[in-house]
Amino acid sequence: MLFMEDDEQIRRYEFKRALEELSKLHGRGTELISLYIPPDKQISDVVAYLRDEYSTSSNIKSKSTRKNVLAAIESIMARLKYYKTPPPNGFVFFEGHIATRGDQTEMYTKIIEPPEPITTFMYKCDSEFHLEMLKTMLEEKEIYGLIVIDRKEATVGFLNGTRIEVVDNVQSQVPSKHHQGGQSSRRFERLIEIAANEFFKKVGEIANNAFMPKIKDIRAIFLGGPGATKEYFFEKDYLRNEVKEKIKDLFDVGYTDESGLRELVEKASESIKDMKISKEKDLMNRFLREVRKPDGGLAIYGEQAIRDALEQKMVDLLLISEGLRKVRYTYRCPTCQAELTLNQEPNEWPVCEKDGTPMELVAEDDFIEDLYRLAKESGAQVEIISDQSEEGKLLKQAFGGMAAVLRFIRKDNVQMM
């Protein structure tokens, strides 16, 4: 059975891929139109605005640019006739002549209904499409603050979904403890404590400055380090109350550099199971437990093995790396209807093996979307794993970006790369 969030996963992936595609496109001149329409905007007002832009664009000096811009505006106005009102989140039109090979151009059109509401009406005509407003919608919503500290070093960072981001790493100038007795020893101890206090103040300032602008979005803050320094730092007034209130727990970790942040996340994810990184870890561990079995257990990996299992409705869980960037090309012979599927664009146009007729390209399918469709049809649970976490990197690098856990073991269970 598919979880409800699976559909959100694939929608987010499709949205991300669309922005990647748009970011690669450029025009010969300022010929690419980006039109953002909020959900509460009247279509009639948008059309009136475009008519004004059409009139203004008629004065563009360059004949080719003028022709292309006017054609793009006309195309958008024609498409708007099919809408009485904008969709619930509004929509964005990307229209214009994009550069192709040599000095050639071709008309390009893409309409996107974003995952979050468009808040501002915007019209831009430029040499590239304006994507800033949409890219903010891809920013990770699951944010945690991270601090690791001892008397020698501290590191402050964020956990954005499954990606660890270092804000700052600072070294202290606190000297080691003085072991000799006498008055000079007590004076030296006071100097040590003064230096430690200044160091903690500095770390607190870094943490406050990093976390306060995002305090409403931060789900929790994790504080870690070796020994009792973390407890002392937490109990004193180095952190603002708003930051201190977000501290979920304190953890013992062995390091206070970037590796300490990774260790802190590891410890936190073990105790807080609703974190995205915890879910991905659990999913990958389920697959790895099967892989480690002498007979491979219920685990399979490799494209063909997974496709065969999906077609036989044997897959219980399918894991796909978000970092996979492949396209499946399907060609068909116009005479005998024979088909050929390739996972990369061929250097030479394929011909039919039966009669030598040049084949026709009939489909270009995104690899992840195609696998997702097969899995959904077979009733498998699908999870798209980010390539930022250690588990995600393992899936992509060691298993080719796709892995599955079967419902039952088949006799010919062979792992294929």
Swiss-Prot record:
Between which residues do disulfide bridges form? Answer: none
Q: Where is the signal peptide?
A: none
As for subcellular location, the record says: Cytoplasm
Key words of the record: Cytoplasm, Protein biosynthesis
State the InterPro entries in the record. eFR1_2_sf (IPR042226), eRF1_1_Pelota (IPR005140), eRF1_1_sf (IPR024049), eRF1_2 (IPR005141), eRF1_3 (IPR005142), Peptide_chain-rel_aRF1 (IPR020918), Peptide_chain-rel_eRF1/aRF1 (IPR004403), Ribosomal_eL30-like_sf (IPR029064)
For the keyword Cytoplasm, the answer is: yes
Q: What is its main location?
A: cytoplasm
- Could you confirm whether the keyword Nucleotide-binding appears in this record? no
Cellular component, GO, one term: cytoplasm
GO MF terms here are: translation release factor activity, codon specific
- Family label: Belongs to the eukaryotic release factor 1 family.
NCBIfam families from the xrefs?
A: aRF1_eRF1
Quaternary state and partners of this protein? Heterodimer of two subunits, one of which binds GTP.
Role, per record: Directs the termination of nascent peptide synthesis (translation) in response to the termination codons UAA, UAG and UGA.
Name under which the protein is recorded: Peptide chain release factor subunit 1
Question: Source taxonomy lineage?
Answer: Archaea, Methanobacteriati, Thermoplasmatota, Thermoplasmata, Thermoplasmatales
Name of the gene: prf1
